[in-house]
Swiss-Prot record:
It catalyses: L-glutamine + H2O = L-glutamate + NH4(+). One of its GO terms (biological process) is glutamine metabolic process. The gene is Gls2. The modification N6-acetyllysine is found at residues 279, 284, 329. It comes from Mus musculus. The keyword Transmembrane helix does not apply. It comes from the Eukaryota. Keywords: Acetylation, ANK repeat, Hydrolase, Mitochondrion, Repeat, Transit peptide. One of its GO terms (cellular component) is mitochondrion. Its EC number is 3.5.1.2. Residues 1-29, 45-66 are annotated as: Disordered. This is Glutaminase liver isoform, mitochondrial.
Amino acid sequence: MRSMRALQNALSRAGSHGRRGGWGHPSRGPLLGRGVRYYLGEAAAQGRGTPHSHQPQHSDHDASHSGMLPRLGDLLFYTIAEGQERIPIHKFTTALKATGLQTSDPRLQDCMSKMQRMVQESSSGGLLDRELFQKCVSSNIVLLTQAFRKKFVIPDFEEFTGHVDRIFEDAKEPTGGKVAAYIPHLAKSNPDLWGVSLCTVDGQRHSVGHTKIPFCLQSCVKPLTYAISVSTLGTDYVHKFVGKEPSGLRYNKLSLNEEGIPHNPMVNAGAIVVSSLIKMDCNKAEKFDFVLQYLNKMAGNEFMGFSNATFQSEKETGDRNYAIGYYLKEKKCFPKGVDMMAALDLYFQLCSVEVTCESGSVMAATLANGGICPITGESVLSAEAVRNTLSLMHSCGMYDFSGQFAFHVGLPAKSAVSGAILLVVPNVMGMMCLSPPLDKLGNSQRGINFCQKLVSLFNFHNYDNLRHCARKLDPRREGGEVRNKTVVNLLFAAYSGDVSALRRFALSAMDMEQKDYDSRTALHVAAAEGHIEVVKFLIEACKVNPFVKDRWGNIPLDDAVQFNHLEVVKLLQDYHDSYLLSETQAEAAAETLSKENLESMV
């Protein structure tokens, strides 16, 4: 009988997936130290949770089925409400934006539409009580919980964006660069435009400056077109027609490598050849539409336009590119049967595709996220294509400044004569900068300055030492309050009656039953001090164990009795009864489950 009990216990432990310190019963606390913690831990293990998995994350059905939603929803509500009975919607959206998420995020569409509908249908005046709040957030609970637990790639997003804004202002000073004039339509660009947008791999967004003004991708489309080609055709096939090495020459030179193919996809000759590989069996319109659909997916279906004026201007004044096209044709660089003029037309069209800094930053973030769009969760590009693309951007993406940029900045990037710089911090974020004045090598002067200042402050350089680079900031590290989540903070919050701090600790998955050297818990301290609201939070929201004994053998109820806190005594006595009942029910359920598991094994 004893061996059977041991086997059942082992199965019960396996069923609770590696619980910590006997947290197998779903009714026992702490809230995020049991089933909820396991669920969130699993979500975090699968690519930092749901924000950028391979499928769009619009709803969290698994959490709903496992019965965890009400408790997670409650904790989110308590954290944002800070003791109030109802939450103004604007307070929720403000708190949401502080995490980096936008109300327009496609993943939150269901949540935001429910909130809007609730406001219209109810007479609450834009206030959500706990029940309404749960209904609104239930389909996005895991994403929202991760956001408020600061479990995104950049935990303290407000602090990080504050630094970015200061760098933006520092780089804003007049540069002395000149707007590109060899394409007549580009010569009309406003030299005062200056904008920067970023999007992390978790979908955190920030923009500063002129980030909603459309501009042509120009050469920034080259790495994107190459990535699409490799995703659809494979690396080996694409590199039969284009090389991988920096040329050491100007981007528009009539030059081939020793194998008789363009040096790389980032020079004009290479980009024209790559354009010729796309959908070779289709007509011009179908080819352009095919690439545009890919670009739209990379941008999370955000703004994408087309400048016909730029396209016509390119065609009328693109003598150098026509010369390159005929040179490639003469050297038989195109696949058999390719129409050289059609390839040039597609190249001109793709250079004339318009984005904004905001939509461009999502495209860059898709590259940073291994080909998966962070705001839709859709897998757009293969991991192989992204790896190859970033490698070539690192070595060849900045014209004749590529070596210097790799040395000083150490990140994959691509510049364009429109004044754009598409910058990728792999596994962290993508950025798009826009400032039309160019330096003598054809790169945005403000953009280069911004990138250099960014890497001088943060340890984003490819070869920065992440452990010992003390002089640089690492925004990926949890800081401040999160770094100091110790039993001292927990017990001090209980001692001082700081329910808001306790809510934050619980939401960040802290074990609310931690003990000090006297084996006293937060519930002991709150009961001894008579903090009724703290006791309520610990027993109602966190479901902590009220029978933990300190080194003198006292449970929290004993402390409340000793210090004559009668309200706390009554509250704890009632909780003892309900806790024992729920524990008995949970043990019975676990016993039944173990028997079923044994029977299925037999």
